[in-house]
């Protein structure tokens, strides 16, 4: 398995997410952000890296991937809500390049998790700007780190 994301793949994921989102009449940015952060924490909980009292921490792979896919879905929804349609192609190129260049994302541990959570929440507390791409790319980078 290669650690790549193509422009076509990301375009297809965004298309699928848009089709899904178009069926939801009451979307709003605050709910998307809250859901995305909650799904991130739910995925982290499946890793159980912080449960040092367990002999074999970590939920089964299907559970982990299910939660990561939920996290990804809300990141894609967030991208569709905050990225202007005219800038979507540029955003896609930036995302694909970030995934290609970022090969050494550290595995999560308690301190790094808190830092990552701070990055997620800080983006919204301080106002969304072009650095939102650092948040939206996270599920892809974690997928490369944990499941490639």
Model-derived features: where do they sit?
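Flexible "arm" and connector segments at domain edges
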Residues: 1-148
């Amino acid at each position: 398995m290669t650690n790549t994301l193509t422009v076509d793949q990301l375009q297809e994921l965004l298309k699928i997410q848009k089709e899904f989102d178009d069926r939801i009449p009451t979307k709003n940015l605050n709910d998307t952000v809250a859901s995305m952060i909650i799904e991130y924490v739910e995925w982290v909980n499946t890793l159980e890296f912080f449960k040092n009292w367990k002999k074999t921490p970590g939920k089964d792979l299907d559970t982990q991937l299910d939660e990561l896919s939920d996290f990804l879905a809300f990141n894609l929804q967030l991208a569709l809500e905050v990225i202007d349609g005219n800038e979507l192609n540029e955003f896609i190129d930036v995302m694909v390049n970030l995934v290609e260049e970022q090969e050494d994302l550290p595995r999560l541990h308690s301190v790094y998790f808190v830092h990552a959570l701070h990055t997620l929440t800080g983006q919204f507390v301080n106002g969304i700007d072009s650095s939102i791409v650092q948040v939206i790319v996270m599920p892809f980078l974690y997928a490369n780190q944990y499941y490639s």
